[in-house]
Amino acid sequence: MSESFSFTGGAVLTPDGVFETADVHIADGRIVDAPSRDGPRIDCRGRVVLPAIVDVHGDAFELEIHPRPGVDLPLDIAMGAVDRQLVTNGIATAFHGLTISWEPGARGIEAGRTFMDALPALRPSLTADHRVQLRWETFTHDAIHDIAGWLRLDPTPAIAFNDHTTLGLADLRSGNARKLDRWAQRAGVSLDDYVACLEAAGEQSGDVAGRIGEVAAMAARHDAVMLSHDEQTASERRASREIGMRVCEFPLAREVAAEAVAAGEHVVMGAPNVIRGGSHTGAMSAEDAVRDGLCTVLASDYHYPSLLHAAERLVARGVGPLAATWTLVSANPAASMGLDDRGAIEPCRRADIIVLDCSGPWRLVHTVAGGVLTTLGRRLSS
């Protein structure tokens, strides 16, 4: 169903952050003031009507494209499966974290080119709004020409400035072969070949700062949202801010998040961190950060269902009421990405809406993405 319909009698989260019993009308992909003459009316009494989820960083799509090292599936099949995962988890807008790295294989430049070339043609067949966050590994200078072209696309991708190379070199020096071996398996090469690529990338360290400035200037010219990544100190956050990185993604220390929040910037942390009770890498707790006002956005990271489950867990544990908690997965992510046409339920906004039954364990009943209605009616734990 993608034309005109109404949700009636539900508890609707208003832009003011309160719930009101109201009807919500959808036509031609937008929220409108009045119902259409012939559109169906869907009874939502006893249910909660919320703006759909906006995911600013998710890389679970990689496993659909590359389910095993060296195994690639057709992009149309893989992204169709990703689309269904998004919709069945209440996500109407997804920024796919596309790593652009010196690594061979799934995260290499050529794989990035293939994805970016294919996505525009796939979009019309997909229900959710599929966008891209370019996860540029800052030692990958061969990709800068490609990035310049991608920044001209519509919609403009976001860009995150990642440095896992320095970490990899540190692991190499310390003899931590386990992590490097895992990365080599992901790239589909031997450990020796991976180390050779890593060391070759490391030889460009003297040029990295200048290249970061170059790419940041390009991104600014195209009004692309820029994100920092894995910052460890407040001084790093300030330096990132100076060149235009206004979103702080996955800070590794409280002082970084506090610096960002004090400057009015959004801080992104992983929803899996919430549902697991902590970070899988030993970084700061997302639940504690939310409780302390140091996290404003949750992202799926590597697991799409975590966004709904994290919101449910935070409400159940008394971290915040539903209205306030929901801003972490809808209004704030939309704002952080500069998407002022979604993240709230009001006329003229894009019709991205979910309907939840919260009478017991949360049950997602309907997802609307760009006016397209999907009826689900399943429990989140199923």
Give the role of each language-model region.
Residues 52-56, 94-96, 130-134, 157-163, ...:
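Hydrophobic faces of well-ordered beta-strands that scaffold small-molecule active sites
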Residues 263-273, 277-358:
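His/Asp/Glu-enriched, well-ordered alpha-helical/loop segment
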Residues 101-231:
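Metal-coordinating catalytic core of metallo-dependent amide/deamination hydrolases
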Residues 153-157, 240-247, 262-268, 293-296:
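Glycine-enriched alpha-helix->loop->beta-strand junction motifs that scaffold or abut catalytic
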Residues 44-115:
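Metal-associated gating/positioning segment near the N- to mid-region
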Residues 10, 28, 329-331, 335, ...:
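C-terminal cap of metal-dependent C-N hydrolases
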Residues 1-38:
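N-terminal metal-binding scaffold of metallo-dependent hydrolase/deaminase domains
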Residues 10, 24, 29, 46, ...:
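Divalent metal-coordination and catalytic microenvironments
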